[in-house]
Amino acid sequence: MLASLRGGAGSPEEQDRQLERSGLYGEYPAIVRAYVELFGDDGSAAEAVKRAVFLVWRSAMALPGVSGIAALPDGTCRAVIEELDARVRRGVEDAELGWMLAWYYGEGAFAFELFGGTSRLTRYAEAVPHHGWRSVHIAPESLAGRGQLGRYWTALTAGAR
């Protein structure tokens, strides 16, 4: 849906209205809430956190007409950042989350600060170089089926090759 609307003609304002009419904007708050519900499931929590963090960060960084994500509810965003902080506090090891977070934080730390990111989270994000993902082999198939997170990282890594 987003791809077809992006290809459409019109000003950014018109594209924004098209996305609004499509109902796409209304779906992302529910998607992020569904990820939040998975935070307590040991088998799904790690991926749910990565996807939710990405969506919170991306919604703060890119205009809705570019990302397809309208502003998310503050309470939902805070719940995501609180869970991320809790994982860091518990010392959960996740190299992929580390280099993803370093990139997000380097590109837009304010998105984390806005929703209650702590100094502990800042230290964690800064422990990996901002461009640390460039030194990691990111297999394209590891990004498949991961929604906007996968599409974003696929495009970013393709541009780096």
Regions found by a protein language model. Name each.
Residues 1-16, 41-66, 92-110, 133-138, ...:
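Amphipathic alpha-helical repeat scaffolds of TPR domains
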Residues 19-34, 69-82:
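Helix-turn-helix repeat elements of alpha-solenoid scaffolds
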Residues 21-43, 47-48, 52-54:
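Non-catalytic substrate-recognition and accessory regions of acyl/acetyltransferase enzymes
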Residues 31-34, 83, 117-124:
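Alpha-helical solenoid repeat scaffolds, predominantly canonical TPR units
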Residues 36-43, 87-93, 127-129:
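Solenoid-like repeat scaffolds
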Residues 64-72, 112-116:
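Short, flexible/disordered intra-domain loops and linkers
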Residues 72-77, 116-135:
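TPR/TPR-like (Sel1-like) alpha-helical repeat modules
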Residues 159-161:
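Alpha-helical solenoid scaffolds in eukaryotic macromolecular assemblies
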